[in-house]
């Protein structure tokens, strides 16, 4: 059986949580492989609503192993809080069903402070739209080879040396920003406080996953955010600090690339974005407002209102290529119910010429204008549909046209936040 990687095919918030939860029924292990607690997702199971940010979605499913891989940056205090929150909802979290890579990078208080200060000090038009949770600064320390990693908490005798190495960078940086230096003792106290709460979950994740792979276990890799926020392939610099494309499932978990298997991209039937950056199909009118209101487009973690626009087939086709997507899960089709006409971006105009890809240049990205194809909407409802027969004819035409434009089949269709309201075309674990 193939393993499955789930990645966002837009700018995040595509509904990955529901799809991962749906797929986790057939998975043995669910792995988070990048990002941090900056990308929240909501799971609706029966009458219970779970809001997760760091824990893999499989944690709410009994009998599943959840894994946080080395590609994640981990805020240990947030982890403790999130475990406590879902435990209060009746979810059992123990070292038996949650494993964290021993070489995962930790987010510290100084990372959060630095992140918030930088974003607040940014001038208008340059703000990245960070969640101010320390994700970027933690990744900077990781690639700068000065990060504190989870395994370091298990070696307190050498911790001071590692903190000093970290502060050798942060002290002059903070002085330049007008911030007070952080005493070594404060960081040590922060780490000593949380160490006994998180160390029991530590494991050599790469070895554990390789053993599971050899034993024929089904592994589901859960991406955070979306491919258009990838630090290399996204709308740079308005991106996140990690690689969000499917290939990072291997690097961020410690497995080889052959372990990835089927790649499922998640895309809304329209487009949303949080924070700054280019958005060719963004709507500033009543239609955009209607999409946002009907889709409840507010961030799970931040509560920020999301920008809304029509489906951009050019961008999704691009992420199909850069992530090697085999099939798409199309979500929130029901939000388009009742629109008399629906537009889809099929190309761009750049300086008077038509182009069929999104340019890498920030200046060129700002100059493109969308070329739309207008389709007839539908008066019937798709909400709660669980088979093609329940969909209006025009809704089916819309889905089929999207498949043609993005050059990938729709494997799953989601028609509400409820897990059961899903139309299965291809099972990624079986087909």
From Swiss-Prot:
Coiled coil location: none
InterPro entries assigned to the protein according to its UniProt record, in alphabetical order: Adenylosuccin_syn_GTP-bd (IPR018220), Adenylosuccin_syn_Lys_AS (IPR033128), Adenylosuccinate_synth_dom1 (IPR042109), Adenylosuccinate_synth_dom2 (IPR042110), Adenylosuccinate_synth_dom3 (IPR042111), Adenylosuccinate_synthetase (IPR001114), P-loop_NTPase (IPR027417)
Reactions catalysed, as given in the entry: IMP + L-aspartate + GTP = N(6)-(1,2-dicarboxyethyl)-AMP + GDP + phosphate + 2 H(+)
EC number of this enzyme: 6.3.4.4
Keyword presence, Oxidoreductase: no
Subcellular location: Cytoplasm
Pfam name, any one: Adenylsucc_synt
Binding site for IMP: 13-16, 38-41, 131, 145, 225, 240, 304
Residue sites binding Mg(2+) per the record: 13, 40
Chief localization: cytoplasm
CDD domains named among the record's database cross-references: AdSS
Any one Gene Ontology cellular component term annotated for this protein: cytoplasm
Cofactor: record remark: Binds 1 Mg(2+) ion per subunit.
Keyword Metal-binding: yes
BP terms from Gene Ontology: 'de novo' AMP biosynthetic process; IMP metabolic process
Alphabetic keyword roster: Cytoplasm, GTP-binding, Ligase, Magnesium, Metal-binding, Nucleotide-binding, Purine biosynthesis
GO molecular function: adenylosuccinate synthase activity; GTP binding; magnesium ion binding
Protein role: Plays an important role in the de novo pathway of purine nucleotide biosynthesis. Catalyzes the first committed step in the biosynthesis of AMP from IMP.
HAMAP family reported for this sequence: Adenylosucc_synth
Name recorded for this polypeptide: Adenylosuccinate synthetase
Gene name as annotated: purA
